[in-house]
C-alpha cells in the first residue's frame, strides 16, 4: 500500500483547513508537515498517530482509532493547546483532483 502524499484537516466549527504534505519518515512511518511548517503529523510507539509542534508537544490525536494504522487515520481528530480544543476531520486528498 502506498502512503498518503497529503491530506487536509478540516475544522468542524468553521471549515478552517490545514494542509499537510508528506515530508520524510518518523519511527519508520511517513511524516507529514503542515504547509506553514509549524506542526507535524507523525507516528510514535508511545503516542501512535498524533500532531506535535517543534518542541515535541503533542497537540492532537485521532478520537476513534487505535492510532496504529500505517497512515494517519481518516477520522475525527481532537486538537488541544492551552485552554482551546477543536474537532477536525482528516480528509485524504485525491491525487487526481
What do these predicted ranges mean?
Residues 1-97:
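Interface elements of modular peptide-recognition networks comprising either
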Amino acid at each position: 500500500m502506498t502512503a498518503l502524499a497529503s491530506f487536509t484537516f478540516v475544522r468542524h466549527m468553521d471549515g478552517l483547513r490545514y494542509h499537510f504534505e508528506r515530508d520524510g519518515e518518523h519511527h519508520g512511518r511517513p511524516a507529514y508537515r503542515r504547509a506553514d511548517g509549524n506542526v507535524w503529523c507523525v507516528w510514535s510507539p508511545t503516542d501512535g498517530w498524533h500532531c506535535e509542534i517543534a518542541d515535541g508537544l503533542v497537540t492532537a490525536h485521532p478520537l476513534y482509532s487505535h492510532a496504529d494504522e500505517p497512515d494517519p487515520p481518516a477520522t475525527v481528530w481532537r486538537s488541544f493547546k492551552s485552554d482551546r480544543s477543536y474537532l477536525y476531520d482528516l480528509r485524504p486528498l485525491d491525487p487526481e483532483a
